[in-house]
Amino acid sequence: MDQRLSVMRIAAMTHSGHVRTNNEDCIGITDWIRTAPMMSPIVIECYVDEARLCVIADGLGGHVGGEVASVLTVRELSTAASGFTGPESVMTVLQGVNKRLYDVMEASPQSTGMGATVVGLAVVGSNVCIFNVGDCRAYVSVGGYLRLLSTDDSVGGAMADSSDRTGLHTHGILQSIGGLKSFRPVDPHLVNRVAEPGERYLLCSDGLTDMLDLNAIEACLTADPKLSVDRLVQAALEAGGLDNISVIIVDMFCNPH
């Protein structure tokens, strides 16, 4: 794909849900970052004339500083995004973000144990690099059906493969950015793909996939990414909204002009 003609149309939304008193999810699109609950999706359209990033971080529930950890994770990734050159640089940055969280914990003992799960999409030239740590998910739409690209770092995560139609997973996070009392290196999952016009990517926190199975998620998708994101969030709320809900949809296409 000629990156000079490549355009990303992105719709994104985060919501605290019906139960949580605060939103520990944070979403980012390059240098735009949001953690406050939203009433409707934002839509951003941009040329892929430089490295672009879409990311969701979910602060670990039951840990101190979940909201701080998710914002810090997104902010650090967003700051580094312009320097992404490929999967190796994404891996290095994620490992650095993990170390950064532990450095913050060491400097501020009251924040010990804070952490976040993360999923993101970095577009570098003609390639899309999908990355995740934890149980936030990334899908690609193929023929109208979603295929899982990320790998759950959770108990039962091995069962959540691309053929799993339940979309549901048990909890018990096996890996996160930060999240422990002392430093542990992180081993992010990376999938590198050649970007193609017409592709759609879906990023989401577990507040979506805990409420909706894959069939229900697919039923919410339309040609309009903003409407699709809104329908997904509303469906998760109607199903209970037990956790914070964050969704990003990325449509890739060529500029007709």
Located regions from the model:
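PP2C/PPM-type serine/threonine phosphatase catalytic domain
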Residues: 1-257
